Amino acid sequence: TAGSEYKTLLFQEDNSQSLNRDDGTTKNIRLIDKVHVHSNRLQVLHQFEEEGGSHPTRYDVTILVNGLPLVQIELKRRGVAIKEAFNQINRYQRDSFWAGSGLYEYAQIFIISNGTHTKYYSNTTRFKHIHEMEGRPATGRSKKSSDSFEFTSWWADGRNHVIADLTVFARTFLARHALLNILTRYCVFTAEHDLLVMRPYQIAATERILNRILISEYDPKKLGTPEAGGYVWHTTGSGKTLTSFKTAQLASNMDGVDKVLFVVDRKDLDYQTIQEYERFKKGAVNSNKSTKVLADQLASPDAKIIVRTIQ
């Protein structure tokens, strides 16, 4: 599990690595290209057999990205509960993901399906579930956090209609562009070493906000008009702060965007938002307690994301 956590950190935060070749030379490589996503190479591996684990293991379907097994799919027959697939991946982690070169510890996302029902979840959901079953708390949070089958996610379309059927799920979630975007843009590896894979409505909201920014960038006449803005409705507990954080992070890296100013309407929300942003990524956000500090931050090229109350 420590190996999986370390490899997730490498992949999410520091994916440029030095590769020591057999001939003694060294080559700098990127585990994945997050800027030009279509330059990454995808392959599908069926029924890979691992003989070096505690027991011989055969994985159903693995999606390799640049040779690394980043997505693992476990399939069950129709009529079999998909929780059986969840438990099967649990056993893989215990018995064989660490075997050989430990490459399966790079898996970021797991997909489970019985054909009729299909769900996805991050590697730390699985990791924390294992610790829960062993009766001891996982690193960073209590056992009652995102650590069990209940925290797996349904995929959905742009109107939030659930896509449960495996064939339709594969056509959408596993479409090359969609999958690469989820891996490179819509995951957050928190300061507590939780890997959060955004839910479909969070991804849809983020993409629509970024699209409005692009519209304003290409047509300055729309700046300050309703066409350049919009509303996003999320219910209580749906992850609004994660949506806003990822939107701010992606927007701050866009051409033509110098600052992202996140305005909240109450002081307690200011503190709460900053705390949550800090949990998602240490040092990612700049807070302020006076107009002078705000002015300094607006003038500074280093303060990319600023949180401020409306008062």
PLM feature spans:
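ATP-dependent helicase/translocase motor core
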Residues: 1-259, 268-283, 301-304
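Alpha-helix N-cap recognition
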Residues: 265-266, 290
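Inter-Walker segment of RecA-like/P-loop motor cores
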Residues: 278-311
